[in-house]
Swiss-Prot record:
Residues annotated for [4Fe-4S] cluster 2 binding in this entry: 144, 148, 151
The keyword Transferase is assigned to this record: yes
Alphabetical list of NCBIfam families matching this protein: MiaB-like-C, MiaB/RimO family radical SAM methylthiotransferase
Location of the Radical SAM core domain: 130-355
Enzyme class: transferase
Protein name (database record): Putative methylthiotransferase HP_0285
Alphabetical list of InterPro entries matching this protein: Elp3/MiaA/NifB-like_rSAM, Methylthiotransferase, Methylthiotransferase_CS, Methylthiotransferase_N, Methylthiotransferase_N_sf, MiaB-like_bact, rSAM, rSAM_horseshoe
EC number: 2.-.-.-
Cross-referenced Pfam families: Radical_SAM, UPF0004
Organism: Helicobacter pylori (strain ATCC 700392 / 26695)
Coiled-coil parts of chain: none
GO process annotations (BP): tRNA methylthiolation
Cofactor note: Binds 2 [4Fe-4S] clusters. One cluster is coordinated with 3 cysteines and an exchangeable S-adenosyl-L-methionine.
GO MF term list: 4 iron, 4 sulfur cluster binding; metal ion binding; N6-threonylcarbomyladenosine methylthiotransferase activity
């Protein structure tokens, strides 16, 4: 039986998609060791030029090692054809065909099967296990109806559509019966869940919270305008993580307008302050170097960031994506300036995060942590605020949910003895 190795690039949604493919392998075995594999399946990411480059380099490397390489994911539409025509890939298949992976691997001839985004495909596979077992990523929707000027993802994932609530509940219930204690709700635009089905993410979360064995629910990312009063009521519940990732993308209205974003700084501030008042950690995304971000604009944006109650951030340098409105804008920012701004933001939020952790210690807030892995005599865990903890213990703690009352604040994480 031939062995298959999955190489997954990019987001949590891709991690779930890889599990869907793995679940559908009937005549092949999987391996976690790249060198053992006869077949390499690349689940690609195309969110930035850097992501494209990493995927391309890996595909070429595997082809040179005489591996049979198949290619799927968001990169199918941006570079799948080029890599296929140059002979690096045996086969290319879009998102619609993930569940046909077993048959595709048995094809003798080379093949290229693109996505048809008009058919609004949703997978039907039930994932029976997840790597790690204590935490699982659950895809609840696919696609995005936002039209942000810089973003290529709607053109490779299609318009927003939601999985049936019944299927999601069944999927989570199955995984929890096998030891999963925490789920992370993922998708292309998670907060749009239910819009096409007369529901919303808050109602889904309430129903998920009733599943036996599920102790904590995390949410991949939300847009500011997707957080309504019904969702805010959930902030009082113990089953919801005490960390929300809210995608602002910038903190200056001029840039939000240039990006064709739906949020604005005044309402963003009001929302974040409301959430922070419930003792929540808050993360966001931030794009530096988008066309139009002059020095004075960034200076004002940085001052706004300083005053926001943020604890986590995923900042990245603007990446020019072909055929997007932003790619036609001419008032670009130098890479040197973009890197300086990126580092300034990272440093700012690093200090905000440490201050937040110190405040929790001062308030005697116990950390509720799910222990994931053991390495070098220490256990690693994530607390309710999405902060890492290193735990020293002689006990078999893996997969345990702990309440840690005594801990130390270190530079980038907390330490505890249990």
């Amino acid at each position: 039986m031939k062995k298959v190795y999955f190489k997954t690039f990019g987001c949590r949604t891709n991690l779930f998609d890889t599990q869907v493919m793995s679940e559908n392998l009937k005549d092949f075995s999987t391996t976690l060791e790249e060198q053992e594999a006869d077949i390499i399946i690349i689940n690609s990411c195309t969110v930035t030029n850097g992501a494209d480059s990493a995927v391309r380099s890996y595909a070429k490397k595997m082809a040179r090692l005489d591996k049979e390489v198949l290619f799927t994911g968001c990169g199918v539409k941006t570079q799948g054809k080029e890599l296929f025509e140059k002979g690096f890939l045996k086969g290319v298949f879009g998102h619609d065909n993930k569940e046909k992976i077993n048959a595709l691997l048995q094809e003798k001839k080379r093949f290229f099967i693109d996505d048809n985004l008009e058919n609004k495909h949703l997978d039907t596979t039930m994932v029976s296990e997840f790597v790690g077992k204590t935490r699982a990523f659950i895809k609840i929707q696919e696609g995005c109806d936002f039209d942000c000027n810089y973003c290529i993802i709607p053109s490779v994932r299609g318009r927003a559509r939601s999985f049936e609530e019944r299927k999601i509940l069944e999927q989570v219930g199955l995984l929890c019966s096998k030891g999963v204690q925490e789920v992370v709700l993922t998708g292309t635009n998670v907060g749009s869940y239910g819009k096409d089905r007369g529901s919303n993410i808050a109602r889904l979360i309430k129903k998920l919270s009733q599943i036996a064995g599920l102790k904590r629910i995390r949410i991949g990312s939300l847009e500011p305008n997707q957080i309504n009063d019904e969702f805010l009521e959930l902030l009082e519940e113990d089953f919801l993580e005490k960390h929300l990732h809210i995608a602002l993308q910038h903190s200056h209205d001029l840039m939000l307008e240039r990006m064709n974003r739906r949020n604005r700084t005044k309402s963003d501030r009001e929302l974040l302050e409301t959430i922070a008042s419930k003792n929540f950690a808050i993360g966001t995304d931030f794009i530096v170097g988008h066309p139009g971000e002059s020095g004075s604009v960034f200076e004002k944006a940085f001052k706004n960031l300083e005053s926001l109650p943020l604890t986590h951030i995923h900042p990245f340098i603007y990446s020019k994506r072909k055929d997007t409105p932003s790619s036609l804008m001419t008032d670009s920012v130098s890479l040197e300036d973009s890197k300086k701004r990126l580092n300034a933001i990272k440093d700012l939020i690093f200090h905000k995060n440490k201050a937040f952790r110190q405040l929790q210690l001062k308030l005697n807030t116990p950390l509720k942590a799910l222990v994931e892995v053991q390495k070098d005599g220490e256990f690693k865990a994530l607390d309710q605020f999405f902060n890492p903890i290193k735990i020293k213990s002689d006990k078999p703690l893996r997969a345990s949910f702990l309440e840690i009352k005594e801990y130390e604040i270190k530079e980038r994480e907390n330490h505890a003895v249990f």
